[in-house]
Amino acid sequence: ATEAQAAINEXPDRVKKDYFYGR
């Protein structure tokens, strides 16, 4: 898995949205 995938999987919902929409 990529670093982004790991961050999304490990991070909470808030971080998930931030990672998805923020980037």
Curated annotation (Swiss-Prot):
Enzyme Commission number(s): 7.1.1.2
Keyword Manganese applies: no
Compartments, as annotated in UniProt: Mitochondrion inner membrane
GO terms for cellular component: mitochondrial inner membrane
Ranges in a coiled coil: none
Tagged with keyword Mitochondrion: yes
Superkingdom to which the source organism belongs: Eukaryota
The protein's assembly and partners: Complex I is composed of about 45 different subunits.
Protein name stated in the entry: NADH-ubiquinone oxidoreductase 29 kDa subunit
Natural source organism: Solanum tuberosum (Potato)
